[in-house]
Amino acid sequence: MTRACAPYLKKSGNGRVVNISAFIGLSAEGSSIAHATAKAALIHLNRCLAVALAPDVTVNSVAPGLMDGTTMFNRISADNTEAAKQRAVLKRHSSLSDVADQVLTFCRADTVTGQVLVIDGGIVFH
């Protein structure tokens, strides 16, 4: 998708790419090695694209943790979601609006590129 859009983003002189990754791409935990590896690859692609598309396009990534209201959240037992909440220093899960707000922040920022922001209530520090 980014490859197809890159010429138009560059032509605008103010292009933005915001990838949605996951905290698991920065942490060696969890039960899905394939998922964690794919998210880690996306995070590295994010950095490579930031260099390749500069100076006309910024490329950043949001890496959410467990979010209320998502399919994944609803698949996990209440005991496990509560345990995750208790691990977070803020003692709460992230929300879809937390992620949307950060995407907008990245879209507004002119001098931020190649960054990954974890939104998980303070479980993974990066």
Predicted features by range, described:
Residues 92-119, 124:
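C-terminal substrate-recognition "lid" of short-chain dehydrogenase/reductases
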Residues 64-87:
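A glycine/serine/threonine-rich, flexible loop-to-helix segment
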Residues 54-58, 112-114:
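Short, small/polar-rich loop/turn modules that mediate ligand/substrate recognition or access, typified
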Residues 22:
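Residue(s) in the substrate-gating loop at a strand-loop-helix junction
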Residues 58-68, 118-120:
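Conserved SDR Rossmann-fold cofactor-binding beta-strand/turn motif
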Residues 7, 50-55:
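Alpha-helical segment proximal to the catalytic Tyr-Lys
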Residues 27-33, 91:
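Active-site loop immediately N-terminal to the catalytic Tyr-X3-Lys motif
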Residues 2, 38, 46:
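Active-site helix of classical SDR
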